[in-house]
């Protein structure tokens, strides 16, 4: 598939996970504008947020890349696959597979499950996370001055990302506006942006996030875990150890 000509592309925007609504509208509008620039069809699906919360109930404190994320991927890929089948498309793919913040196997398995429901449809699995592809992604983002999203999208990701930031003495996430919680509001420097998605930064974030997930909803235990982590990070910074950033 990667070597075949692709002459009919449609962007199907179905992301009921994105919270709050303002962040959702910002991301959607940017997609619409870029599609218009490239002459690509854009399908604006419903903001089905009530259904998303219903399907993820009981998973509020699951870690990133956990069961909640699988449910989230499945929900969106199922809807994309249905649209593709009903409108004669041969394949589906997802930008989620381009991010090192995502477990590519988890993403691909979701896409494959969704596509397997239809005999005339396949899921396009490709290695989008190479250094070359990551740099290309950030070159495009900088050229277009895309809005820099500071977390994955859902309210639980927003909560956990802000917890991680507090533990690292990083300002909390800002929704919209011309100022980000950290760094630039828009992509401007491919080298800096790619560094923020280095494997080292990603691994560090998930190591801490998984520990918080084990604590769950207990506020006292979460606070204690964050304080322990924060003290360790201060010691590492004093020793000259790497202190990463958070750029989704």
Task: Briefly describe each language-model feature range.
Residues 1-248:
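Nucleotide-activated chemistry modules centered on ATP-dependent adenylation/adenylyltransferase
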């Amino acid at each position: 598939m990667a070597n075949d000509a692709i002459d009919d592309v449609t962007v199907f925007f179905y992301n009921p996970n994105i919270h709050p609504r303002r962040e959702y509208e910002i991301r959607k509008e940017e997609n619409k504008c870029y599609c218009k620039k490239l002459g690509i069809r854009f399908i604006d699906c419903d903001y089905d947020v009530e259904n998303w919360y219903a399907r993820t109930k009981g998973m509020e404190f699951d870690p990133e890349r956990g069961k909640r994320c699988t449910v989230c991927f499945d929900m969106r890929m199922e809807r994309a696959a249905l649209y593709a089948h009903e409108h004669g498309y041969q394949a589906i793919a997802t930008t989620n597979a381009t991010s090192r913040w995502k477990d590519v196997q988890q993403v691909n398995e979701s896409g494959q499950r969704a596509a397997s429901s239809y005999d005339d449809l396949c899921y396009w699995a490709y290695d989008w996370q190479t250094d070359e592809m990551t740099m290309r992604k950030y070159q495009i983002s900088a050229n277009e001055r895309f809005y820099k999203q500071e977390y994955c999208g859902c309210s639980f990701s927003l909560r956990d990302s802000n917890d991680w930031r507090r533990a690292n003495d990083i300002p909390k996430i800002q929704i919209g506006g011309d100022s980000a919680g950290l760094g630039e509001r828009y992509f401007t420097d491919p080298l800096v942006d790619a560094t923020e998605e280095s494997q080292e930064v990603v691994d560090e974030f998930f190591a801490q996030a998984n520990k918080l997930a084990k604590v769950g909803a207990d506020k006292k235990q979460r606070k204690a875990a964050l304080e322990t982590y924060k003290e360790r990070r201060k010691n590492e910074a004093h020793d000259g150890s790497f202190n990463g950033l958070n750029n989704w």
